[in-house]
Amino acid sequence: MNIQKKTQFMTLTALLTAIAILIPLVMPFKVVIPPASYTLGSHVAIFIAMFLSPWMAIFVIIASSLGFLMAGYPIVIVLRAFSHIFFGTLGAFYLQKHPQTLDNPKSSLIFNFVLGLVHAIAEVFACIIFYASTGTDLKNMFYVLFVLVGFGTIVHSMIDYYLALAVYKALRKRH
């Protein structure tokens, strides 16, 4: 990687990191019903980083988790944000091998849905670990874990994916 590419990579990583930290702090459109939270656009920087590089995605995910922590979200939501490391890393490595996925609407939809499932499973698992460690009776949490967090995450993830894809494609055309 030449110096110009390295500089561009670092600059993009820094910009996406700043966005990932700021969104949980300043986004006015959010619904928080712990352990569920829906902040419009909260995954956009992660997805754009994922479209570009696994290492960029990992760094932006860690920064996003810090953003949720700094914004004062409950720790279970911060843990959910950190669980993005699974879908972000898997997605980034997949796209490295299959970059054409983003340009084919059918492949992109399937990729988005599978990513949403991985995303939801990781978030539900993070919640289960958190609540099991606090002594909470998980039997009474089916609705919260599988409807609010699980299904809600799939929908939220898929919406943010398409927002990120639109931004990514627009920027790619201009560059």
Regions found by a protein language model. Give the residues of each.
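Loop-helix junctions at membrane interfaces
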Residues: 1-175
